């Protein structure tokens, strides 16, 4: 990895470490999403505690954390594998933010933002998959898991040179959802819009 790639990777992690959910909740004088609801600083939990406006703001900011560094690397001509490393660094920053005591979110929105520079057709298909599963079953975590499982295949169809880094990124997100998988199997996972949760760290 050359100096430019290393700098881009470090910058991606630091940008990913800026917790949009925590900062937006502070700005709107809402409870800290790490301490209420599902205890997850992501758009789904902010939707529960702050409504649609706050959740959309978090979603867009989290996506930009992935888009900005990957798009920068893309235009600088960085190798696809290194672009994947940059994307993973941004998601790791979101999941384990150095600025917020390493207590972060699940990385779905940031990963979507990181995939966007590959192509709008791929991004649209990924978003359509998430929305379809979410509308049908009303589980944010299930929608995320189904989406990340099929995204490497979508990538292979549209831009096969990016399949490996995208698959690596998807594996990271599946790992971060291990508790959600357990709750889905036991029927304890809360649905989108539910206010009360019985366990921490849902979607």
Curated annotation (Swiss-Prot):
Catalytic activity, reaction form: an acyl phosphate + sn-glycerol 3-phosphate = a 1-acyl-sn-glycero-3-phosphate + phosphate
Pathway info: Lipid metabolism; phospholipid metabolism
Subcellular localization(s) per the UniProt record: Cell inner membrane
Membrane topology term: Multi-pass membrane protein
Entry keyword annotation includes Glycoprotein: no
Class of the enzyme per the UniProt entry, highest EC level: transferase
PANTHER family associated with the record: GLYCEROL-3-PHOSPHATE ACYLTRANSFERASE-RELATED (PTHR30309:SF0), INNER MEMBRANE PROTEIN YGIH (PTHR30309)
Name of protein: Glycerol-3-phosphate acyltransferase
GO-annotated molecular function: acyl-phosphate glycerol-3-phosphate acyltransferase activity
Regions that span the bilayer: 4-24, 68-88, 117-137, 155-175
Keyword GTP-binding belongs to the record: no
Keywords per UniProt: Cell inner membrane, Cell membrane, Lipid biosynthesis, Lipid metabolism, Membrane, Phospholipid biosynthesis, Phospholipid metabolism, Transferase, Transmembrane, Transmembrane helix
Species in which this protein is naturally found: Vibrio parahaemolyticus serotype O3:K6 (strain RIMD 2210633)
Family: Belongs to the PlsY family.
């Amino acid at each position: 990895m050359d100096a430019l790639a290393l700098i881009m990777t470090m910058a991606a992690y630091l940008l990913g470490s800026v917790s949009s959910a925590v900062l937006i909740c502070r700005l709107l004088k809402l409870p800290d999403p790490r301490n209420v609801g599902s205890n997850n600083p992501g758009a789904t939990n902010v939707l529960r505690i702050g409504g649609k406006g706050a959740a959309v703001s978090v979603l867009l900011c989290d996506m930009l954390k992935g888009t900005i560094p990957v798009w920068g690397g893309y235009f600088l001509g960085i190798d696809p594998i290194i672009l994947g490393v940059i994307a993973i660094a941004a998601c790791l920053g979101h999941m384990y933010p150095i600025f917020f005591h390493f207590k972060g979110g699940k990385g779905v929105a940031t990963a979507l933002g990181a995939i966007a520079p590959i192509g709008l057709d791929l991004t649209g298909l990924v978003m359509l998959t998430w929305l379809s599963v979410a509308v049908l079953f009303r589980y944010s975590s299930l929608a995320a898991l189904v989406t990340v499982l099929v995204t490497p295949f979508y990538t292979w169809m549209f831009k096969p040179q990016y399949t490996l880094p995208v698959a690596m990124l998807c594996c990271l997100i599946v790992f971060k959802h291990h508790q959600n998988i357990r709750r889905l199997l036991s029927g304890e996972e809360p649905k989108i819009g539910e206010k009360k949760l019985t366990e921490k760290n849902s979607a």
